Amino acid sequence: MGKSCKVVVCGQASVGKTSILEQLLYGNHVVGSEMIETQEDIYVGSIETDRGVREQVRFYDTRGLRDGAELPRHCFSCTDGYVLVYSTDSRESFQRVELLKKEIDKSKDKKEVTIVVLGNKCDLQEQRRVDPDVAQHWAKSEKVKLWEVSVADRRSLLEPFVYLASKMTQPQSKSAFPLSRKNKGSGSLDG
């Protein structure tokens, strides 16, 4: 196990951010249970990557954003990844995710961060307000992975989080500027 990764989980209020984490990590979320508004919370989980290595991930569960509120500045420092959550039964929550992605892009200081997007409540088909094709098209144009999930089906949560942990902890690829002993010239600055 390497370093602990920091992941910020964010989205509009009442889209299921805390429920997703509770179900993923503990398997104990009861659908329909009373919702308690989150101020800010930290969850620590151990996720097996696609390489078979267990990695520790610290999830920063943020307060649901309302009425144009922005993500607090501290959410951008030293962050390795983001989970942006919207509810498939709320077009407004999807639009909030679009804005959050732009905010992250402006604030990440050229640092490589992994972003996954979750469309929660996909089991509520009759209440759907976000077209899955539109959402996938947006995700593709933004170069992020998007999954539709349901807290009621814990298995639907596994793939996105395995992907996230795997991507954040993958070994560094070879440098684009390999150091080679076969230099042209001597490298001397003497005339």
UniProtKB/Swiss-Prot annotation:
Which tissues is it found in, per the record? Widely expressed.
Q: Which InterPro entries match?
A: KBRS (IPR042227), P-loop_NTPase (IPR027417), Small_GTP-bd (IPR005225), Small_GTPase (IPR001806)
Q: Name one GO biological process term.
A: inflammatory response
Query: Which annotated residues bind GTP?
Result: 11-18, 61-65, 120-123
SUPFAM superfamilies in the record: P-loop containing nucleoside triphosphate hydrolases (SSF52540)
Q: Where is this region: Disordered?
A: 169-191
Q: Which keywords does UniProt give here?
A: Cytoplasm, GTP-binding, Nucleotide-binding
Please give the PROSITE patterns that the UniProt record associates with this protein. RAB
Q: Gene Ontology terms, cellular component aspect?
A: cytoplasm
Pinpoint motif Effector region by residue range. Answer: 35-43
Q: Where in the cell is it found?
A: Cytoplasm
* Source domain of life: Eukaryota
Q: What is the effect of changing residue 44 to D?
A: Does not affect interaction with GFOD1
**UniProt region (Small GTPase-like), positions on chain:** 1-191
Instruction: Copy the domain comment.
Output: In contrast to other members of the Ras family, the members of the KappaB-Ras subfamily do not contain the conserved Gly and Gln residues in positions 13 and 65, which are replaced by Ala and Leu residues, respectively, and are therefore similar to the constitutively active forms of oncogenic forms of Ras. This suggests that members of this family are clearly different from other small GTPases proteins.
Q: How does it assemble?
A: Interacts with both NF-kappa-B inhibitor alpha (NFKBIA) and beta (NFKBIB) in vitro. However, it probably only interacts with NFKBIB in vivo. Interacts with GFOD1.
User: What protein name applies here?
Assistant: NF-kappa-B inhibitor-interacting Ras-like protein 2
Q: Which organism is the protein's source?
A: Homo sapiens
* Gene this chain is encoded by: NKIRAS2
